A protein has these predicted regions:
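Solvent-exposed edge beta-strands and adjacent loop segments
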Residues: 1-66, 96-122
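Short hydrophobic/aromatic patches at helix-to-coil boundaries
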Residues: 2-4, 130-134
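Acidic glycine-/aspartate-rich tracts in secreted/extracellular proteins
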Residues: 65-70, 126-130
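Short, acidic/charged, Gly/Pro-enriched secondary-structure junctions
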Residues: 71-105
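Short solvent-exposed strand/turn elements
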Residues: 118-132
Protein backbone atom coordinates (compact mmCIF):
# COMPACT_ATOMS: atom_id res chain seq x y z
CA UNK A 1 0.00 0.00 0.00
CA UNK A 2 1.34 3.41 -0.95
CA UNK A 3 1.16 6.72 0.87
CA UNK A 4 -1.86 8.68 -0.25
CA UNK A 5 -3.64 11.99 0.16
CA UNK A 6 -7.22 12.36 1.32
CA UNK A 7 -8.29 13.62 -2.10
CA UNK A 8 -11.16 11.60 -3.47
CA UNK A 9 -12.34 10.21 -0.15
CA UNK A 10 -16.00 9.82 0.65
CA UNK A 11 -18.12 10.38 3.77
CA UNK A 12 -21.70 9.18 4.03
CA UNK A 13 -24.01 9.89 6.99
CA UNK A 14 -27.48 8.47 7.54
CA UNK A 15 -30.33 10.94 7.64
CA UNK A 16 -32.84 10.62 10.48
CA UNK A 17 -34.78 8.02 8.48
CA UNK A 18 -31.75 5.74 8.14
CA UNK A 19 -30.92 6.45 4.48
CA UNK A 20 -27.21 6.88 3.78
CA UNK A 21 -26.44 10.25 2.20
CA UNK A 22 -23.03 10.91 0.67
CA UNK A 23 -22.26 14.46 1.79
CA UNK A 24 -18.58 14.63 0.82
CA UNK A 25 -19.23 17.60 -1.46
CA UNK A 26 -20.45 19.68 1.50
CA UNK A 27 -17.62 18.72 3.90
CA UNK A 28 -14.54 20.96 3.86
CA UNK A 29 -12.62 19.16 6.60
CA UNK A 30 -13.08 16.67 9.40
CA UNK A 31 -11.29 15.04 12.29
CA UNK A 32 -11.83 11.65 13.83
CA UNK A 33 -10.38 9.84 16.79
CA UNK A 34 -10.41 6.18 17.81
CA UNK A 35 -8.88 6.22 21.30
CA UNK A 36 -8.70 3.41 23.83
CA UNK A 37 -9.08 3.93 27.54
CA UNK A 38 -6.29 2.81 29.84
CA UNK A 39 -6.24 2.08 33.54
CA UNK A 40 -3.12 2.53 35.61
CA UNK A 41 -2.70 -0.63 37.71
CA UNK A 42 0.83 0.07 38.91
CA UNK A 43 1.56 -1.65 42.19
CA UNK A 44 3.81 -0.25 44.89
CA UNK A 45 6.40 -2.85 43.94
CA UNK A 46 6.87 -1.47 40.38
CA UNK A 47 9.33 1.12 39.12
CA UNK A 48 7.47 1.69 35.83
CA UNK A 49 3.81 2.08 34.90
CA UNK A 50 1.65 -0.99 34.45
CA UNK A 51 -1.60 -0.50 32.53
CA UNK A 52 -4.66 -2.32 31.25
CA UNK A 53 -6.25 -1.41 27.95
CA UNK A 54 -9.95 -0.62 28.36
CA UNK A 55 -12.88 0.31 26.14
CA UNK A 56 -12.59 1.53 22.56
CA UNK A 57 -14.21 4.78 21.49
CA UNK A 58 -14.87 6.88 18.39
CA UNK A 59 -15.53 10.56 17.87
CA UNK A 60 -15.80 12.68 14.76
CA UNK A 61 -16.29 16.33 13.89
CA UNK A 62 -17.46 17.18 10.40
CA UNK A 63 -17.18 20.77 9.13
CA UNK A 64 -18.65 22.10 5.95
CA UNK A 65 -20.37 24.70 3.83
CA UNK A 66 -24.12 25.24 4.21
CA UNK A 67 -26.09 23.46 1.49
CA UNK A 68 -29.86 23.14 1.78
CA UNK A 69 -30.46 21.13 -1.38
CA UNK A 70 -32.37 17.90 -0.81
CA UNK A 71 -30.56 14.89 0.69
CA UNK A 72 -27.31 16.70 1.49
CA UNK A 73 -25.70 18.10 4.64
CA UNK A 74 -28.43 20.42 5.93
CA UNK A 75 -31.12 17.80 5.30
CA UNK A 76 -29.03 15.23 7.19
CA UNK A 77 -28.09 17.38 10.20
CA UNK A 78 -31.07 19.71 10.58
CA UNK A 79 -32.87 16.97 12.53
CA UNK A 80 -30.06 16.56 15.10
CA UNK A 81 -31.72 18.90 17.66
CA UNK A 82 -35.14 17.25 17.39
CA UNK A 83 -34.63 13.55 16.59
CA UNK A 84 -32.43 11.34 18.77
CA UNK A 85 -31.26 8.54 16.49
CA UNK A 86 -27.93 6.87 15.90
CA UNK A 87 -26.65 7.49 12.39
CA UNK A 88 -24.20 5.34 10.49
CA UNK A 89 -21.15 7.34 9.45
CA UNK A 90 -19.03 5.64 6.79
CA UNK A 91 -15.64 7.06 5.89
CA UNK A 92 -14.12 5.55 2.74
CA UNK A 93 -10.70 6.12 1.24
CA UNK A 94 -8.76 3.96 -1.19
CA UNK A 95 -11.03 0.97 -0.68
CA UNK A 96 -10.75 1.16 3.12
CA UNK A 97 -13.87 1.99 5.11
CA UNK A 98 -14.65 2.85 8.72
CA UNK A 99 -18.37 2.55 9.49
CA UNK A 100 -19.64 3.54 12.94
CA UNK A 101 -23.00 4.06 14.60
CA UNK A 102 -22.79 7.66 15.79
CA UNK A 103 -24.83 10.08 17.87
CA UNK A 104 -24.43 13.65 16.64
CA UNK A 105 -24.86 16.03 19.55
CA UNK A 106 -24.83 19.40 17.75
CA UNK A 107 -25.39 21.02 14.38
CA UNK A 108 -23.81 24.45 14.73
CA UNK A 109 -24.08 27.09 12.02
CA UNK A 110 -21.65 30.00 11.80
CA UNK A 111 -22.08 33.11 9.68
CA UNK A 112 -18.69 34.82 9.58
CA UNK A 113 -18.21 38.57 9.25
CA UNK A 114 -16.96 37.98 5.71
CA UNK A 115 -20.26 36.32 4.76
CA UNK A 116 -19.56 32.59 4.58
CA UNK A 117 -22.09 30.27 6.20
CA UNK A 118 -20.52 27.12 7.58
CA UNK A 119 -21.55 24.29 9.88
CA UNK A 120 -19.98 21.87 12.33
CA UNK A 121 -21.39 18.54 13.52
CA UNK A 122 -19.61 16.64 16.31
CA UNK A 123 -20.51 13.00 16.93
CA UNK A 124 -19.65 10.18 19.33
CA UNK A 125 -19.81 6.39 19.25
CA UNK A 126 -23.36 5.14 19.83
CA UNK A 127 -23.60 1.39 19.38
CA UNK A 128 -20.88 -0.12 21.55
CA UNK A 129 -19.17 -1.72 18.55
CA UNK A 130 -15.39 -1.33 18.37
CA UNK A 131 -14.42 0.99 15.47
CA UNK A 132 -12.80 -1.26 12.86
CA UNK A 133 -11.34 -0.36 9.48
CA UNK A 134 -12.29 -2.86 6.79
Amino acid sequence: MAKESGIGMSIAVDDSGGSARTISNDITDFSLSTPRGVQDITGLDKSAHETLQLLADFSITLNGVFDDASNVAHAVFSTVPSISVARTVTITISGQSLPNETFFNDYALTRAATGELTWSAPGVLAGGTVPTWA
